[in-house]
UniProtKB/Swiss-Prot annotation:
Keyword vocabulary terms for this entry: Cytoplasm, GTP-binding, Initiation factor, Nucleotide-binding, Protein biosynthesis
Gene Ontology molecular function: GTP binding; GTPase activity; translation initiation factor activity
UniProt feature, compositional bias: Basic residues: 69-81
Region G2, residue ranges: 222-226
UniProt signal peptide: none
Subcellular location per the Swiss-Prot or TrEMBL entry: Cytoplasm
Record-linked Pfam families: EF-G_D2, GTP_EFTU, IF-2, IF2_N
Chain segments carrying region G5: 333-335
Region spans: Disordered: 54-105
Protein's name in the database: Translation initiation factor IF-2
Encoding gene per record: infB
Positions contributing to GTP binding: 197-204, 243-247, 297-300
HAMAP family documented for this protein: IF_2_B (MF_00100_B)
Organism classification: Bacteria, Bacillati, Bacillota, Bacilli, Bacillales
Species assigned in the record: Bacillus anthracis
Length: 686
């Protein structure tokens, strides 16, 4: 008999991998994960164990009979009791009325209470409370608001404890959108999967192959509507795939605080190996903290070498299970549809072990996958429901937009009325187009949804989206002191691989006040827009060694407020990071020439010195600028302006093509033909 894996045995005997692993531990048999091999001896032990637990047919029949009998009895009891139910309720209500109202031990309130409200909560007459307030020197009417201190004073007089409830504003629903539900309300949901990888390694082909071979039963041959996400079914279990365009969308969502993906599939071509975008995808997935499955594609090619792919990926801490690691590698051929079932089974296996759950019995919350404006339908948004159930007609707030769900379309183009957890749907009915990554929440009341949506839109105008504080070396020390930073994320780019490794190794050794450096991505070549997007999503600082950012990277860094540091000497990088962490980073200044003036004539004045009659030939000369005197192309003096005049008046600046009078501090040897160059020192944005 050949060896069998844990998950294969579980599948064969119709039990979950998790239950089987628990059983093995009870039997004192160590297994590391669901891919562990079981030998013949262990398999025999398990067979005996499960055989012993299995009830006989007679037992099963007896149990079933008891259940049926108990159901019948309960129905009889219900019938008997039905006639007297109203009488019992009347008697109970009567008894309640005759009972005296007891004083509570504790009351709760939020904000303030009126005298009448406080009297109700304390089970007292309002006149009694007014009398007590009068005794305290407070003249109050029944509708007058009382502050927290007064409420506590009155309640304490009756020996009643007071608790103030802090109400979280529903406008900021992101703060409580991810609150954990009670365990008994949670039910299994499909896993949400994102496919990433290098260009031309077969991401799109894999998505198409999965979609075409595994559309839900009855939909084969139907036109699949592209809504940015879709579901497939295998063994009566669903999997949701996000068809996000590239890594940028993935990180943009993460930058907005939306964690939509449960599992990431990294596609690597067997004939091409690990490429720059593959590494990028790995770092994006690691930064998101989700399980990774490696799909080794193009196995049908003659040059396919899966061992090489495995070897290369071990450098990025993705060690295959066959080599003692815990990363699942699945060989596939997307174009021929080979290995697709195995890949989907691995996704279901991870789902089973991770136990992805949500509460379907609440108002829906989730994330926008994509959105657009359609001429005929208006605003169309693809939403991924992450918790709760979304229904047609639900009032909804999406980012800063709001509305009522007018219509819902599934990934196969069918109109649906409800969408549960992990279901992607396209909706209409919003007042404006939201952004990918915006969170949404359904509400019971349309008026409330409108009010919250308008408030959020107003707040967004006051504080522009994306202006959240990004980590920079200037404020690093302050953030460390305030306890905001426990780990510094860095992205390292250099001109050669040797420099990358040397710099990363040196940076990892830095440890100041328990704050450590974490390198989230390294690479060779110019700093790209993709690096900046990853830095923005992960709140990281980008360090370039002998490389520069390209035009798009510069523009994106300015928009996202990402700190880029460029260096030519490794120890300077280390010194700068350490200095920043210790709060000793000095600001860096850069000289900027703002203008030049030519000396046309000189005048010697007693007690004043030499006055130069000048003509501004370029830019401008300002009163607070530094100056240098240039004679025959050589700088002969550097200092400060003493006076700057137009005719007899002191002025702050003189523009190009105007004349002026200039005196220089502690320098009188000015001659006709000298050039006075004005400059200022500007702090460099690092």
């Amino acid at each position: 008999m050949s060896k069998i894996r844990v998950h294969e045995y579980a599948k064969k005997h119709n039990i979950s991998s998790k239950d089987l692993m628990t059983k093995l531990k009870e039997m004192n048999i160590e297994v590391s994960n669901h891919m562990t091999m079981l030998d013949d001896e262990v398999v025999n032990k398990l067979d005996n164990e499960y055989q012993a637990e299995k009830p006989s047919v007679a037992d099963e029949f007896e149990v079933e009979e008891k259940v049926v009998r108990s159901k019948k009895n309960s129905n009889k009891k219900k019938k008997k009791g039905k006639g007297n139910e109203d009488k019992r309720q009347e008697n109970f209500a009567g008894r309640q009325q005759t009972q005296t109202v007891e004083t509570p031990d504790k009351i709760t309130f939020s904000g303030s209470l009126t005298v009448g409200d406080l009297a109700k909560k304390l089970s007292k007459e309002p006149s009694e409370i007014i009398k007590k307030l009068f005794m305290l020197g407070i003249m109050a009417t029944i509708n007058q608001d009382l502050d927290k201190d007064t409420i506590e004073l009155i309640a304490n007089d009756y020996g009643i404890e007071v608790e103030e409830e802090v109400i979280v504003s529903e406008t900021e629903f992101e703060t409580f959108i991810d609150e954990q539900d009670d365990e008994e309300n949670l039910k299994e949901r499909p896993a949400v999967v994102t496919i990433m990888g290098h260009v031309d390694h077969g991401k799109t082909t894999l998505l198409d192959s999965i979609r075409n071979s595994k559309v839900t039963a009855g939909e084969a041959g139907g036109i699949t509507q592209h809504i940015g996400a879709y579901q497939v079914e295998l063994n009566d279990k669903k999997i949701t795939f996000l068809d996000t365009p590239g890594h940028a969308a993935f990180t943009t969502m993460r930058a907005r605080g939306a964690q939509v993906t449960d599992i990431t599939i990294i596609v690597v071509a067997a004939d091409d190996g690990v490429m720059p975008q593959t590494v990028e995808a790995i770092n994006h997935a690691k930064a998101a903290g989700v399980p990774i499955i490696v799909a080794v594609n193009k196995m049908d090619k003659p040059a396919a070498n899966p061992d090489r792919v495995m070897q290369e990926l071990t450098e990025y801490e993705l060690v295959p299970e066959a080599w003692g690691g815990d990363t699942i590698f699945v060989p596939i051929s997307a174009i021929q549809g080979e290995g697709i079932d195995n890949l989907l089974e691995m996704i279901l296996l991870i789902s089973e072990v991770e136990e992805y759950k949500a509460n379907p019995n609440r108002y829906a919350t989730g994330t926008v996958i994509e959105a657009q404006l359609d001429k005929g339908k208006g605003t169309i948004a693809t939403l991924l429901v992450q918790n709760g159930t979304l229904r047609v007609g639900d009032p909804i707030v999406v980012g800063t937009s709001f509305g009522r769900v007018r219509a819902m379309v599934s990934d196969i183009g069918r109109r649906v009325k409800v969408a549960g957890p992990s279901t992607p749907v396209e909706i209409t009915g919003l007042n404006e187009v939201p952004q990918a990554g915006d969170r949404f929440m359904a509400f019971a009341d349309e008026k409330k949804a409108r009010q919250i949506g308008e408030s959020r839109a107003q707040e967004a105008l006051l504080a522009q989206r994306g202006e959240k504080s990004k980590l920079s070396l200037e404020d690093l020390f302050q953030q460390i002191q305030e306890g905001d930073v426990k780990e510094i994320n860095l992205i390292v780019k250099a001109d050669v691989q040797g420099s990358v490794e040397a710099m990363a190794a040196s940076l990892r050794k830095i440890d100041v006040e328990g704050v450590k450096v974490k390198i989230i991505h390294t690479g060779v070549g110019a700093i790209t827009e993709s690096d900046i997007i990853l830095a923005s999503a992960s709140n990281a600082i980008v360090i370039g060694f002998n490389v520069r950012p390209d035009v798009n990277a510069k523009r994106t860094a300015e928009l996202e407020n990402v700190d880029i540091r460029l260096h030519r000497i490794i120890y300077k990088v280390i010194e700068e990071i350490e200095a920043a962490m210790q709060g000793m980073l000095d600001p860096e200044f850069e000289e900027k020439v703002i203008g030049q003036a030519e000396v046309r004539q000189t005048f010697k004045v007693t007690k004043v010195g030499t006055i130069a009659g000048c003509y501004v030939t370029d830019g401008k000369i300002t009163r607070d600028s530094g100056v240098r005197i240039i004679r025959d192309g050589v700088v002969i003096f550097e200092g400060q302006l003493d006076t700057l005049k137009r005719f007899k008046d002191d002025v702050k600046e003189v523009a190009q093509n105007y004349e002026c009078g200039i005196t220089i501090e502690r320098y009188n040897d000015l001659k006709e033909g000298d050039i006075i160059e004005a400059y200022i020192m500007e702090e460099v944005k690092r």
